[in-house]
A protein has these predicted regions:
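Charge-dense, intrinsically disordered terminal/linker segments
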Residues: 115, 159-160, 174
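OB-fold ssDNA-binding interfaces and closely related basic DNA-contact patches used
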Residues: 1-99, 149-168, 184-189
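Beta-strand-rich binding-surface signature
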Residues: 64-66, 103, 108, 123
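Hydrophobic side chains in beta-strands
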Residues: 69-71, 111-113, 128
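Short, low-complexity, polar/charged sequence segments that are solvent-exposed and flexible
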Residues: 88-92, 102, 129-133, 144-148
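Elongated alpha-helical scaffolds
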Residues: 100-118
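OB-fold/S1-family single-stranded nucleic acid-binding modules
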Residues: 114-144
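Interfaces that engage single-stranded nucleic acids at replication/repair/recombination sites
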Residues: 133, 138-144, 163-189
């Protein structure tokens, strides 16, 4: 299985003046997955580090990258902007791609999946194409919408499965909602 995509993230965007290390615009967060409202559906919640009630309750966070992209193989224009959530292996590969190819919004990338959808053994290969002009939409802010940013009180409610999710606002159930005709929940693979 494969997809031809255009990323909405440039990759390397500069250098940290204090460390000299490259800075990237990939949205990479330490997050928790849990059913916050008793619906039976896991949500993504931003980890608060040392003050995180979810960590204290034994819910281990994981480092995740949330890549927004245009899936050029998708025929329905309303579903072309998609979100792809990846882990550490793909974070390293994306950093390698930007180091080698520069601004990733300037070229299409063919992504090839080896393995079954949903399998932990599935791997992905990335094949950047020649640079070409294409207008891409701006990447959406995910923290506060798809990634819940909860205060201590709401973290405790989430642990107990009794957080009230509302339409709009920080605890919004935006995973299936549309922003400007684009759904944040469309998945590539």
């Amino acid at each position: 299985d494969s997809a031809q995509v255009r990323l909405l993230h440039k990759g390397e965007i500069g250098t940290d003046p204090t460390t000299g290390e490259p800075e990237y615009d990939f949205p990479i967060y330490e997050v928790h997955k849990l059913d916050v409202d008793g619906s039976g559906r896991d949500r993504t919640v931003l980890c608060k580090g040392e003050s995180c009630e979810l960590c204290r309750a034994g819910n281990k966070p994981s480092l995740r990258m949330f890549i927004q992209l245009v899936n050029l193989d998708e025929k329905d224009k309303e579903k072309q902007v998609q979100l792809w959530e990846r882990g550490l292996t793909d974070i390293k590969q994306m950093i390698g791609l930007t180091s080698e190819y520069g601004d990733l919004t300037k070229r299409n990338i063919k992504i090839v999946r080896s393995g079954s959808k949903g399998s932990l053994k599935t791997t992905y290969q990335y094949f950047p194409k020649d640079p070409s002009e294409m207008e891409v939409p701006e990447a959406q802010k995910l923290v506060g919408s798809l990634i819940l940013d909860l205060d201590k009180e709401d973290q405790i409610k989430a642990i107990e499965g009794r957080l009230q999710l509302s339409k709009g606002g920080n605890n919004a159930d935006n995973e299936g909602s549309s922003r400007g005709g684009r759904s944040a929940a469309n998945r590539v693979f």
